[in-house]
Amino acid sequence: MSLTYMNMFMAFTISLLGLLMYRAHMMSSLLCLEGMMLSLFVMMTMTILNTHLTLASMIPIILLVFAACEAALGLSLLVMVSTTYGMDYVQNLNLLQC
C-alpha cells in the first residue's frame, strides 16, 4: 500500500472517528461527513487511474453528485433547526414533527 493511499485511509478514519465522537453539534457532523466524502473521492479516483479502468471513470463524479446533494440537504436541515430552536444540537432533530 502506497503512502498516498495510507494518508487517504487515515483521513477517512479520522473523519469517521470525528463523526462518532463529536456528534453533539450538527455542523461538526456535517464537516466530518464532507471529509469522509472527499477522502473517498480521492481514493476512488486514484484507484481508477492506477488500474486504467475506463468504464469506471464516471463513478467518482457520481459520488461527488451524491456528496453535493447530501451537503445541500444537511445545510438546509441545519438552517431549519437553528432558526427554529436557536442551536444546532443533534438532539433537536428528535423534536421535529413532519
Curated annotation (Swiss-Prot):
Keywords: Electron transport, Membrane, Mitochondrion, Mitochondrion inner membrane, NAD, Respiratory chain, Translocase, Transmembrane, Transmembrane helix, Transport, Ubiquinone. Its EC number is 7.1.1.2. It holds the Pfam family Oxidored_q2. GO terms for biological process: ATP synthesis coupled electron transport. The chain crosses the membrane at residues 1-21, 29-49, 61-81. The keyword Translocase applies. GO terms for molecular function: NADH dehydrogenase (ubiquinone) activity. It catalyses: a ubiquinone + NADH + 5 H(+)(in) = a ubiquinol + NAD(+) + 4 H(+)(out). One of its GO terms (cellular component) is mitochondrial inner membrane. The keyword Mitochondrion applies. Changing L3I: In strain: Isolate TK 135728. It comes from the Eukaryota. It is found in: Mitochondrion inner membrane. It is a multi-pass membrane protein. Core subunit of the mitochondrial membrane respiratory chain NADH dehydrogenase (Complex I) which catalyzes electron transfer from NADH through the respiratory chain, using ubiquinone as an electron acceptor. Part of the enzyme membrane arm which is embedded in the lipid bilayer and involved in proton translocation. Belongs to the complex I subunit 4L family. Core subunit of respiratory chain NADH dehydrogenase (Complex I) which is composed of 45 different subunits. This is NADH-ubiquinone oxidoreductase chain 4L. It comes from Vampyriscus nymphaeus (Striped yellow-eared bat).
